[in-house]
């Protein structure tokens, strides 16, 4: 897929990267126990942004854990200095063609399942996913790519360290790409003991105390993609991770070899000259205020006008600002634009819990091809991306607690809106690019199917009104 350069967008790129770094540091969600999501990060050139998802099927490493079905949302951004790759965000310290050095934070995709805890783990303290601070070096040559990464648990979850060494080879032919890879992960005792050990206080019949200590895991993978069009790409992969023998000997581990199958798709917003790099490209500023809906007033009911009322009991509210830059205009000649946004929202919890803030990064499509838009321009918008909350909003925390389900500070974000040009309404040319409207601020965990998002089945909806203007 063709990419474009963002030499004119460094300020926004840096802002986006800063937001995602903060989001990664503030998020703490359980995830699967088999390693790295990086093979499914199809963007490589500055100026690329993308959205997608990958479904994975594979066995749990834990005894009686059964098979796991997981959805990994792909939130992708490749700026000149910063990047977002699925479960990691970072800064490029060196990007010199054949060599690249990154400093990053990453969500460790490892830990006990939070939705269905197997009997073998009953009575044990939860082994949570952690946030790693890492340094990555890559060296690309025609004969292949070598990579070395050092990761340290920055959130004191396991207090462990890991060194990863890998080799991969990129084969391309027309729209096809295949990438076989081999990697080894040297894990210290703290990391392995946390995720695969049994503490003395957790020992039980058939589950003696055990500490595997340091060890080496090996992963063999084959990942591929097919370009359906300039921007749509199909993704697939196979992998097999061989756990260290001392991990396999743990009384809570059932398998030494963990296979995985992956299928997905991604959309690349590259392929055009960036609108924000053009002279006079506007910056969008949006102010919003809204209130929470009742628990049963879900997004589908709202967008179909079956539920348009806010909560009458424990009515919490939000106020926020969003800043955006246009990525694409008039896609394929249609009245369809794509705008990338960074948003900051304050939650007023009315004394029910401490107030908090929420960071959102999302791409939004605007359709304006209505028959009356030549008289009163009307935009129907739908945004999709990622949301990181300082703490789970009261609406989410209370609903999940009532159902005995976990919460997650990191969730999927959707932002459907409908607005009208204020200038067209009142006959003011100066306000032609100022819009008033209403929308829904929606956070959710993809129906409990994504362990990266904490297996949350539920979320929150806030009905809001707003004013947005291009400056």
Can you describe what each PLM-predicted range is?
Residues 1-50, 64, 204, 210-215, ...:
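Cleavable N-terminal export/targeting peptides
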Residues 34-94, 100-130, 270-272:
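Outer-membrane beta-barrel initiation region
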Residues 68-111, 132-135, 139-151, 284-352:
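Glycine- and aromatic-enriched membrane insertion/assembly motifs of diderm outer-membrane
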Residues 51-57, 88, 103-107, 148-152, ...:
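Transmembrane beta-barrel strands of outer-membrane/channel proteins
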Residues 33-48, 81-98, 140-143, 172-178, ...:
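Short loop/turn motifs that connect adjacent beta-strands in outer-membrane beta-barrel proteins
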Residues 72-76, 257-284, 459-471:
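Outer-membrane beta-barrel "beta-signal"
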Residues 50, 72-74, 132-134, 164-166, ...:
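Membrane-embedded beta-strand positions in outer-membrane beta-barrel channels/transporters
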Residues 154-234, 240-247, 252-255, 327-329, ...:
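Outer-membrane beta-barrel transmembrane domain signature
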